[in-house]
Amino acid sequence: MYSAATVANAFIRIAKKNGLALSNLKLQKLVYFAHGWCLAILGKPLIKECVEAWLYGPVVPDLYHALKRYGSGVVTEEIPDVPEIPENSGAYPFLNAVFNKYGMYTPAQLVAITHQPGAPWQNVCPRSVIPDELIAEYFKNLPEKLKGSANAGK
């Protein structure tokens, strides 16, 4: 299990390699999707922190506060003083698969995905924790899967 900041930093590095920039909102969604797919495919959480239901979808509060200085703009630097996920670790192919699936969407499109009928965000009270069990069940029932990532991270 990693901190959400560690996973966000990995996504920042992946985005830079692909010539893309990420906002706080987009990072929140990528971390959430990675966590959800990890729960569904590997049966274990990716991040240590709880995910909460906020206005624009699932949010990891500590990650939000670490990046809020960027507002809706581009996150230009990695979050300091957090451990890295080594690029040769089993987690990196998994994170790359999540990025390849969701990284090209706009923040608004990612919010729309998290707000779809039956999504965990809709099934809890605002500003409350979204239980990992609810997230896992939702991602297990999605028709699409992350190709080639079922064994990643094992």
Predicted regions and their residues:
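Domain-edge interaction signal
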Residues: 1-154
